[in-house]
């Protein structure tokens, strides 16, 4: 089963390329973005508008209440159902997104452990984290899964809790499960188109322009609407880049100017982490916008690659 993945850092033009390729290849787009799933959060997540979708069906956008907390497992189960539906209708799933963890899990067909829906074990571990701190939780993980613990830092609180949860629910270290998962064939045969810039300054400029556009379109008003709708201030959705900073503006603890600069900084840092993740994948065919004369040329570059690999 073949899928097409359009990947790249934030603000790299994934939506436009994914839509263009979906139109050419009789495809439908599946968003692989951990925040675009939430309703009422289109501006800050840069979810595609109806005009940007150009009539191409999109999935996994605005499907969840922002008060809900979606685990990687829940996301992948829902996205996989979308992929299977698209394939059953003879169309090509075009996966577009920047949440690398979710994309990798989807392609591999990860066998998620019990408890990953946010059950009693997770809630208890979260309470212990609040009471004891990340250092103690990481120490616990070192005792039962030293291989996973060695890859994590104190700030990786969610991953520490996830690894502890897997061990407590299954009696098996996450590192062993991961190793077994790497040994089995991937669920999907994936072709990857990656979008980026050779000159980092160009990507930084794109990110800054996108943030300015979000503010112009009403990011602050979007945050205020979420709060007015009863969304708790500590909801996971409001911890996302953009929302966290403008929540402070809504609360009067920061100015809009301070929030804008913070969002730009955090977005650049996020883009760097995305690229670090993506560069581990040698299968990605990279297209650099600053090396292509225009969008049609970049699209042709992508099409030529896909045709050479039997898609097109």
Where are these regions (language model features)?
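Phosphate/pyrophosphate-binding catalytic cores of soluble transferases and nucleic-acid-acting enzymes
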Residues: 1-312
């Amino acid at each position: 089963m073949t899928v097409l993945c359009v990947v790249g850092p934030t603000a790299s033009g994934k939506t436009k390329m994914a839509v263009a390729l979906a139109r050419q290849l009789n495809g439908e787009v599946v968003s692989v973005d951990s925040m675009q799933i939430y309703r009422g959060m289109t501006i800050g997540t840069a979810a595609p508008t109806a005009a940007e979708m150009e009539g191409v069906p999109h999935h996994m956008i605005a499907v969840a209440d922002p008060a809900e907390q979606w685990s990687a497992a829940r996301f992948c189960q829902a996205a996989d159902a979308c992929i299977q539906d698209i394939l059953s209708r003879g169309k090509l799933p075009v996966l577009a997104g920047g949440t690398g963890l979710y994309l990798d899990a989807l392609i591999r067909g990860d066998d998620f452990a019990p408890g990953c829906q946010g059950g009693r074990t997770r809630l208890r571990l979260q309470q212990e984290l609040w009471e004891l701190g990340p250092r103690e939780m990481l120490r616990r993980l070192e005792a039962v899964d030293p291989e996973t613990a060695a890859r994590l830092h104190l700030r990786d609180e969610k991953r520490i809790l996830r690894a502890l949860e897997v061990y407590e629910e299954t009696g098996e270290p996450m590192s062993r499960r991961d190793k077994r998962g790497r040994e089995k064939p991937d669920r999907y045969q994936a072709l990857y188109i990656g979008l980026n810039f050779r000159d980092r300054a160009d990507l930084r400029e794109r990110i800054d322009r996108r943030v300015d556009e979000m503010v112009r379109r009403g990011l602050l008003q979007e945050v205020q609407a979420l709060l007015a709708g009863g969304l708790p201030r500590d909801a996971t959705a409001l911890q996302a880049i953009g929302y966290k900073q403008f929540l402070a503006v809504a609360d009067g603890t920061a100015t809009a100017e301070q929030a804008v600069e913070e969002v730009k900084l955090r977005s650049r840092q996020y883009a760097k982490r995305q690229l670090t993740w993506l560069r581990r994948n040698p299968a990605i065919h990279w297209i650099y916008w600053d090396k292509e004369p225009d969008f049609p040329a970049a699209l042709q570059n992508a099409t030529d690659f896909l045709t050479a690999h039997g898609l097109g």
